[in-house]
């Protein structure tokens, strides 16, 4: 992947932050040896497998996250041993689920936050990893949207999730506010991929009431 740099893998997100052979565990070696030479197939075609080093409690359908065709094997599923059938596309159900104690594999009941450095290494910032908050001022969010879309707000009054996927991640988002001339203005973003590309943040969290800042 990084042949021009003389590397097989880097320690950043594009290679899932490879941390070198000094951090290889016995379980990782065992898993690699047990699956050597094996590939996942679906209808005589190699599967388009995806990986993430973290989870929010539930995965999203592949075609909602990436610009790919629908894959029957990339459906939404629970990130835990507990088969949670909660309908997270419903706004109230999602907010309740988000504030409850998570049973997912990367939640604090499975991995205590004090032990995170063992798994994250020295690359990631210390702090909340499974449930966390990011805040932007009105001006900061206006600049982010302008830089990514060229759409100019003078003020953003509200962010409205119009549709959520099976994981609760927003698939359709409306940004409401005013233009510089004072007229009402709105921006509609109609895919989870586009929302991430524009906002540059994880958007699988509740959009709050506005108190001079937007927090996720």
PLM segments and residue spans:
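Conserved, single-site charged/polar hotspot
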Residues: 1-216
């Amino acid at each position: 992947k990084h042949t021009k740099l003389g590397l097989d893998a880097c320690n950043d997100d594009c290679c899932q932050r490879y941390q070198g052979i000094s951090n290889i565990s016995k379980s990782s070696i065992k898993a690699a040896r047990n699956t050597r030479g094996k590939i996942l197939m679906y209808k005589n075609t190699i599967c388009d497998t995806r990986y993430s080093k973290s989870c929010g409690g539930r995965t999203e359908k592949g075609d909602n996250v990436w610009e790919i065709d629908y894959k029957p094997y990339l459906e939404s599923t629970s990130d835990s041993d507990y088969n949670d059938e909660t309908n997270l596309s419903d706004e109230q159900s999602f907010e309740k689920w988000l504030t409850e104690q998570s049973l997912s594999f990367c939640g604090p009941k499975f991995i205590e936050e004090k032990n995170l450095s063992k798994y994250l290494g020295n690359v990631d910032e210390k702090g909340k990893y499974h449930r966390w908050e990011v805040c932007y001022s009105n001006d900061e969010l206006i600049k982010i949207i302008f830089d990514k879309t060229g759409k100019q707000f003078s003020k953003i009054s509200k962010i409205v999730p119009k549709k959520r996927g099976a994981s609760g991640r927003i698939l359709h988002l409306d940004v409401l506010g005013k233009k510089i001339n004072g007229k009402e203005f709105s921006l509609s973003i109609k895919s989870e991929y586009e929302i991430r590309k524009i906002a540059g943040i994880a958007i699988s969290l509740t959009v709050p009431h506005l108190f001079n800042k937007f927090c996720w």
